[in-house]
């Protein structure tokens, strides 16, 4: 499972290193291929291919004319691109995805159990602040209580 937050740089060619701990999890549990796609929060999601294929199969079973499904397919599936790691553990992030997430020089990788988020440093700081403000909401507290009982 992916966990932790890691700050990295992105070079002029759009490459960034996948943090070693995330790479070890990826290689140990999956393989070295990631699917990058746009996320609804103006970041990118990096899925191991196996997790992505499971998501696609679940979506394929749904009615594509259902509004939520159609929107997810347009925003999530249509933007997805396979991005293998190079021999140095770097990922080339396509220009359209870099632009969408505002990735320029400093990026933040965030392990989110089965998916990895890739943020601009500024976007991550804003998302963290929003999460802190929501942390005491009844919904968050309910989920936390359920997790502790499991």
Curated annotation (Swiss-Prot):
Instruction: Enumerate the PROSITE patterns for this protein.
Output: SPOVT_ABRB
- Give the GO cellular component terms, alphabetically: cytoplasm; nucleoid
GO MF term list: DNA-binding transcription factor activity; transcription cis-regulatory region binding
Keyword Transcription regulation tagged: yes
Against InterPro entries, the record matches this protein to: MraZ, MraZ_C, MraZ_dom, MraZ_N, MraZ_sf, SpoVT-AbrB_dom, SpoVT-AbrB_sf
Q: Which family does it belong to?
A: Belongs to the MraZ family.
Q: Which HAMAP family match?
A: MraZ (MF_01008)
Task: List, alphabetically, the PANTHER family matched.
Answer: TRANSCRIPTIONAL REGULATOR MRAZ
| Protein's recorded name | Transcriptional regulator MraZ
Q: What is the lineage of its organism?
A: Bacteria, Pseudomonadati, Myxococcota, Myxococcia, Myxococcales
Gene assigned in the entry:
mraZ
């Amino acid at each position: 499972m992916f966990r932790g937050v890691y700050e990295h740089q992105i070079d002029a060619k759009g490459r960034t290193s996948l943090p070693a701990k995330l790479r070890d999890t990826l290689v140990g549990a999956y393989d070295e291929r990631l699917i990058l796609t746009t996320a609804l929060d103006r970041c990118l999601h990096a899925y191991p291919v196996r997790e992505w294929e499971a998501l696609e199969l679940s979506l394929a079973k749904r009615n594509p004319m259902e509004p939520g499904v159609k929107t997810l397919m347009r925003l999530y599936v249509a933007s997805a691109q396979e991005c293998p790691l190079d021999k140095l553990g770097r990922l080339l992030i396509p220009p359209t995805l870099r632009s969408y997430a505002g990735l320029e020089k400093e990026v933040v990788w965030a392990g989110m159990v089965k998916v990895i988020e890739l943020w601009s440093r500024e976007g991550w700081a804003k998302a963290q602040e929003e999460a802190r403000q929501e942390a005491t909401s009844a919904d968050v507290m309910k989920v936390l209580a359920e997790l502790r009982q499991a």
